[in-house]
Regions:
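Active-site and donor-binding regions of nucleotide-sugar-utilizing enzymes
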Residues: 5-156
């Protein structure tokens, strides 16, 4: 796998898959020989993603379900991390799902894989302490809401 033409991508839910599908489509249009691996749904797979796990396995809600499924979720994250370390993508794009992606992104970044995160966690509304983790995990944050960019600029 040619590192300069490979991008790791992970979306954990349908809305992320829709956004990711649009991103992958545009990247393919600009660089026809780019390849993608990670986790995604129908849209991302349609646009060329090799999905390592079923995205639906990451879609957990509430307090009890994530706790029940914690061993499986940790195993999936470890598996994706090992895949990325082995294949050394040019960059890794985490789409939303911050509770899953930020830890993975931090590990990858510590191992010199560039990380991009699409859809900012709402640190401006709740859990502002996550800004420290984001700084450690993410090389570039792509925000959907205009004021989010200002928030990140104010907080370094």
């Amino acid at each position: 796998m040619d590192r300069s033409q490979h991008i790791g991508v992970l979306a954990g839910e349908k809305s992320g898959d829709i956004l990711g599908g649009a991103v992958l489509r545009e990247l393919k249009r600009r660089r026809s020989n780019v390849s993608f691996s990670g986790i995604g749904g129908e849209q991302m797979i349609f646009h060329g993603l090799t999905s390592l796990h079923d995205m639906e396995r990451l879609s957990v809600f509430g307090l009890v379900e994530p706790l029940k499924r914690l061993p499986e979720l940790l195993s999936i994250r470890r598996s994706v991390g090992q895949h990325m370390m082995k294949h050394q993508p040019q960059l890794f794009l985490g789409i939303d799902s911050p509770d899953f992606n930020l830890t993975l992104e931090q590990t990858l970044r510590q191992n010199r894989i560039k990380t991009v995160h699409l859809v900012s966690p709402s640190v401006w509304a709740w859990r502002p302490g996550r800004i420290r983790k984001i700084k450690k995990a993410v090389d570039l944050m792509l925000c959907l809401l205009p004021f989010e960019r200002d928030f990140y600029e104010q907080h370094g």
